[in-house]
Every structure is written in C-alpha cells, then in structure tokens.
Design a protein with these regions (language model features):
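Active-site-adjacent loops and short helices of periplasmic peptidoglycan-processing enzymes
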Residues: 1-149
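Domain-terminus/edge residues, biased toward the C-terminal soluble/receptor-binding domains
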Residues: 114-115, 126-131, 135-343
Length: 343
C-alpha cells in the first residue's frame, strides 16, 4: 500500500482474518498518539503500573507492580521493544481498564474501515478471536504514519535504554532496520498461533510504502517477503504531486464585501500514483461556488480544484479563502454606487 493515497499495489489473501500477534500494537500506538494529540494525556504524565500489566508474558521490559513510568518511556518501549507490559499499562491509563481500551480499539478500527478486525487485548497475545487481516493492518499502519509521522523517531531506533529498578536496554525487534536502507518501521509480531508477522514501512524519493506479511513460517522469511514487496513498489510506481498547500489559484468575487475579491488558495496537497516510465501529467479545472457573500471568514470553502489525468478525474481538493473579508458598511456601499452611477 502507498501511504499518502492508500492505494494497494499488490495483494494476496489480504482480507483473510488471522492472528496478528504484536502487530496489534500499531493500533495501541495509534490510540496513544490520538490521546496525546487530543490533550487527554501528556508525554510527561506518570503511569502507575498495575499488577495486571506487570504480569504480561512474552516480550516485555519487566515492569513491577506500582512502578511509575512516563507515557513517553512506555510508548518508546512499545515501539522499539514491543513490550507487552508497557502496552497494557498504557491501555489501562487511557481507557481506565484494558477491556475498556479494547473497546476503543474496535471503535477506531470500525471508523477506519477495517472490515475484519476484532481486537481482544492491547498487546497481541493469542486468544481465540483476536484477528486482523493484512488489509486491516495496512489501514491502521497508514493512519499511524501519515497522521503521526513523528512515531518514526522510535520505530527507526535500533537501540535505546530506559531506567526503572536498573538501566534496561531496548533493542528493536524489526530487523528490517538493518537489512533495508529505506526502512522507517513499523512493527513485528510472533506467537504460536500467529507465526511470524510484520507491518513494514519504508520511504524513498518522497513515497512511503507499507508491506504486510502474516503467518510466515520463519522469522527471516517475513522480512525477505516484505523487502520483495517494497522493492516492487519503489521500482514500478511514482507519486505525482498537485499544487502546494496555500498556492493561490484565482480571485473570487465577494458580494457586499469590504473588498471586491479574495484569493482562493489550495487547502491541502493532492497526490496520485502513476506507473514509472509513464508520461502521466495532472491537469486541473477550477469550480467556484457562485455568489459568495460577505462576511467571509479566513479558510472558508470557496470551491474545488479538480485534478485530471487525461479525461479521467483523479480527485478534488478544497479551495479556501486566503483572508477574511468583512461585510461592507453603508459608506463603502454608497461610494461604490456613486462610482457606478457617474463613471
């Protein structure tokens, strides 16, 4: 999957629901970053470790009951070392309990269109119905890396340390960081049921790709297959960029405004995929809302910029007002009428 567009470049059995193991933690990380972004928690907040969180088996940082760590330390431990105890501690901190956090995970999955996803815990340990498809994993991975690209601060870190009872070393579980020059993350997973899983991300020439491997029979195979998928994407596709955010497109007439017109600017950048070697070029058409009347707030939608390749519409972005335009007062309106009358 290409991250900026969400377009799937290659897939096989992508809708089959399977145990995801610790790749589950992509959703856990996404909800942590959401909570920080929304102001619910801060990176410096202290988290008291519960007995339940400390009891997690599998990959862990050996947290003790009643130990206190910051949100930042626990998040780093999840992203780098795939720590189950840290994941459950953060789930309890955000949700109040792991079960309540799992409800948030499933709600988020539904809102993202993850059609087969069913979470039963925050860390990915095997249960009967904890299942995701490769497409589900690609969708949540895309949301994490495009909405919070700063996560790569941790997902690209090979080794780090934290301090609790003693200094504890963190080593990244993602060997792709050593094997693939353009790797940016993201998350490994392995259990008896899930076998070996991977959500791999890599960025080259401004294009970021996501490769998902599930149920590989050995740990090295998941990395080799992910590299093959990433190489395929980078070798065969390129991104075409539209106009830049804030670029001025046209002057829009404003009825009864202090100013006669306002600049319509691009609200967001548009990108689309094309085959490498193709001569595909983007063309545009402007569609403006008729009869825009003052007052107009800065950022008001004034129309749309429509992108085409040939005769095929590829997408649309909003055109918004660059500045605010207040309603004209009676004196201004009188001056305009006088000008029109005597010109």
């Amino acid at each position: 999957m290409e991250a900026s567009t969400g377009k799937i470049l290659s897939q096989q059995n992508s809708d089959t629901a399977l145990p995801p193991a610790s790749v589950t933690k992509v959703m856990t990380l996404l909800l942590i970053y959401d909570a920080v972004h929304n102001g619910k928690i801060k990176w410096t907040d202290n988290v008291t470790i519960s007995e339940h969180a400390a009891s997690m088996g599998g990959s862990q940082i050996f947290l003790e009951p009643n130990e206190v760590q910051t949100v930042e330390v626990l998040t780093k431990s999840i992203a780098i070392a795939s720590a189950n105890d840290a994941a459950v501690a953060m789930a309890e901190f955000i949700g109040g309990s792991e079960d309540a956090f799992v409800e948030l995970m499933n709600q988020k999955a539904k809102s993202l269109g993850m059609k087969t996803a069913h979470f039963e815990n925050a860390c990915g340990l095997d249960t009967d119905n904890h299942l995701l498809s490769a497409k589900d994993i690609a969708i949540m991975s895309r949301e994490l890396i495009t909405k919070y690209p700063e996560v790569t601060k941790y997902t690209t870190t090979w080794q780090d340390t934290i301090t609790h009872t003693t200094e504890f070393g963190l080593t990244n579980t993602n060997k792709l960081l050593k094997w693939y020059n353009n790797a940016t993350g993201l998350k490994t997973g392995s259990t008896g049921k899930a076998l070996y899983c991977l959500s791999a991300t890599a960025k080259k020439d401004g294009m970021e790709l996501i490769a998902v491997i599930m149920a590989a029979p050995d740990p090295k195979l998941r990395f080799r297959e992910a590299i093959q998928l990433l190489d395929f994407g980078f070798a065969n596709y390129k991104l075409i960029h539209g106009k830049k955010v804030g670029e001025e497109i046209t002057d829009v007439p404003i009825y009864k405004g202090e100013k006669d017109t306002v600049k319509a600017v691009v609200q967001r950048e548009f990108t689309t995929l094309a085959n490498k070697g193709s001569k595909a070029e983007l063309t545009t058409k402007t569609e403006i809302i008729p009869s825009v009347q003052a007052p107009v707030a800065k950022g008001t939608k004034l129309g749309e910029l429509v992108y085409y390749i040939g005769n095929k519409e590829m997408g649309r972005v909003n055109l918004i007002s660059k500045d605010a335009v207040n309603k004209a007062n009676l004196g201004t309106m009188f001056q305009r009428l006088t000008y029109l009358w005597f010109r």
